[in-house]
Structures are given as structure tokens and as C-alpha cells.
């Protein structure tokens, strides 16, 4: 049904979905076979790098999101996530039963992770900016071209954030 086929457009691919099985491919199989767009959390905890590569090769406009919680950038410890208490430890955020509950992923780390699993930096950047903007119908965002919003970042050779520009103006993100 079209309702079932739209699920992978509104859900992090692989997460809270039955695993891919050769006799019952489920939503993951439908996305891999038919989707133009789907989203994935590239924190290397939610999805194994091998499964990420399968999705990246199968879904032309697979885009990546952080799914970050308030624990991102904070030390390990307990944090609130809605009505839940979650624990940040070893880069992950988990409920008391061990279930992943969001992430601590930042966009710059997402870029480094995508490059680490073999994507060229240009494709990794596109999957973090242009493809999500396109999915949302925001063609004036997610790309550097005349008429687009000039929101961008500059990184050094190690892909560490050095500058942030919002509407074409450099901002002091280190003291924000």
C-alpha cells in the first residue's frame, strides 16, 4: 500500500523496523528496492557501516540526519528526553532497557563518518544538505548557488569545523 511505502520516508531507515529477510523483506526491503528518498542516522551506532553502504547504493537520494538529543556535546551522564531519563555513554544515548534513544551525533561528525565509510566528501556533503532540503521541497537550501541561502560551514583538512556562515555572514560559533 502507499501508506506502507511512505513509512521509510518518515522513519530512520532500519530503526524500529523488522530486519530485512529474504522471504519477508518488509519496509527495509521496500525502501531498498523502490525508494528515491529515505533517511538514515550515520552515527555508526544506529546502523552498521555495511548496512549503510547497502542503503547508499540502493536509494539514490538517501539523506542523513543526526537525531541528536540534548545530550549532544555534553559529558556522559543522565539527561531528560521528553518524559524519559536517558543515559549518554560511549557516544550513544539509551533508555534504561538499553534501547537507543536518539543520538549525540553532530553534523560535522556525520560528515566524517560518511567519509570514513568510503563516500567522497562531495557526496557525503550532498547527503547531509542538498538531499534533505530537496526532500522537503526547499530547493533554495542545501546548495551553494546564486539565489540560495548562504548558510554554510568551512572545515579544515581533518574535517574539523573552522567557520560557520549564516545568511552569508560569518558567526562566532565557538562562543555562541
Mark where each language-model region is:
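Short, small-residue-biased leader/transition segments that mark boundaries at the very start
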Residues: 1-8
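Catalytic core of soluble alpha/beta enzymes
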Residues: 5, 15-30
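Short beta-strands and strand-loop turn motifs
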Residues: 9-13, 39
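Short, acidic/turn-prone active-site loops that include or flank metal/cofactor-
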Residues: 13-19, 44, 68-70
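Short acidic/glycine-rich loop or secondary-structure boundary segments that cap or lie
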Residues: 19-20, 47-50, 71-76
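His/Asp/Glu-enriched, well-ordered alpha-helical/loop segment
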Residues: 26-40, 56-148, 152-155
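Short, Lys/Arg- and Gly-enriched loop/turn segments at beta-strand edges
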Residues: 159-164
